[in-house]
A protein has these predicted regions:
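Short helices/loops that flank or line small-molecule/ion binding pockets
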Residues: 6-20, 33, 50, 115-135
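Sec-exported extracytoplasmic/periplasmic mature domains
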Residues: 13, 17, 32, 70-73, ...
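Structural recognition of the beta-strand scaffold that forms the well-ordered cores
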Residues: 19-21, 40, 55, 77-79, ...
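Short beta-strand-centered segments that line the small-molecule binding cleft or hinge
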Residues: 18-20, 27-51
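Bilobed "Venus flytrap"/periplasmic-binding protein-like clamshell domains
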Residues: 1, 25, 48-124, 135
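Extracytoplasmic/secreted cell-surface and envelope-processing proteins
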Residues: 9, 30, 88-90, 119-121, ...
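A ligand-binding cleft/hinge motif common to bilobed small-molecule-binding domains
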Residues: 21-34, 97-98, 123-124, 128-149
Length: 196
C-alpha cells in the first residue's frame, strides 16, 4: 500500500503502479523521481486550479496576513496541514520563508493536522490561524460544518493546478494506450459528477 507522495513516486518508478491520481506536490515528486507524465487533470467547480489560503477567526485580532507575520502574530498558534500537502504546508511555508519568517520560531505553537480540523479549530477559536485550500473551506461552509462568518481568509496564493492523473514513463511511451486512458477519463467524468 502506498501511503505518501514519495511512496507513490517510487511505485511509479519501479513499475508497481502505472497510473495515479495525485496532487501537485505528488506530481512534482513523481515527475522528478520517476519521469511520470500528466495525461489529464480534474476540474473542480469547472476550474483547473485552486488556491492555498490562510484563515483566522474574526475575533483573533489578526485582520491581515501582515498581522499574522508581524508582532501581532508572534507567539500565536498556527496550524499547517500534513507536510505532504501543497496547499496546507508547502505553499504557505514558502510564503513565510519569502517573508523571512520561520514559523517554528515566530509562532508560539505550530501544529500539523488535517484540512477539516484546521477549519473546525479556527472557527472554534482553538487555534489562531491555519493553512488550508479554498475548496475545502467552501465545501465545509456549504455542508454546514463551519459558519462562513467564523472563518476569515487573510491570505490567498497564486492559482495552483488541480489534481493530476499521471502515468508511468513506461506507459507514457505507448501513445495509443495514453489516448485510450484520456478518452476513458473524459467519458467517465460526467458520471463522476452525478455519482461521486
Amino acid at each position: 500500500t502506498v501511503d505518501s507522495w514519495e511512496g507513490l513516486a517510487k511505485s511509479l518508478a519501479n513499475g508497481e503502479t502505472d497510473i495515479a491520481l495525485m496532487g501537485p506536490w505528488g506530481y512534482v515528486l513523481a515527475n522528478h523521481f520517476a519521469d511520470a507524465q500528466v495525461v489529464s487533470t480534474i476540474l473542480y467547480q469547472g476550474k483547473p486550479e485552486y488556491f492555498a489560503i490562510m484563515v483566522t477567526h474574526p475575533g483573533s485580532g489578526l485582520n491581515s496576513v501582515q498581522d499574522l507575520i508581524g508582532p501581532t502574530g508572534k507567539g500565536r498558534t498556527f496550524a499547517f496541514g500534513d507536510k505532504g500537502s501543497t496547499s496546507g504546508y508547502l505553499i504557505p511555508l514558502h510564503f513565510f520563508m519569502q517573508q523571512g519568517i520561520d514559523p517554528e520560531k515566530h509562532f508560539g505553537r505550530v501544529v500539523y493536522t488535517k484540512h477539516q480540523a484546521i477549519q473546525t479549530q479556527v472557527t472554534a477559536g482553538q487555534i489562531d490561524a491555519g493553512a488550508d485550500f479554498n475548496r475545502n473551506r467552501s465545501t465545509m461552509i456549504d455542508q454546514g460544518l463551519i459558519q462562513a462568518e467564523r472563518s476569515k481568509v487573510i491570505w490567498q496564493s497564486a492559482p495552483l493546478p488541480n489534481d493530476a492523473v499521471a502515468v508511468s514513463a513506461a506507459l507514457f511511451k505507448d501513445k495509443a494506450l495514453v489516448k485510450r486512458v484520456q478518452d476513458a477519463l473524459q467519458e467517465v467524468g460526467p458520471q463522476l459528477k452525478i455519482q461521486p
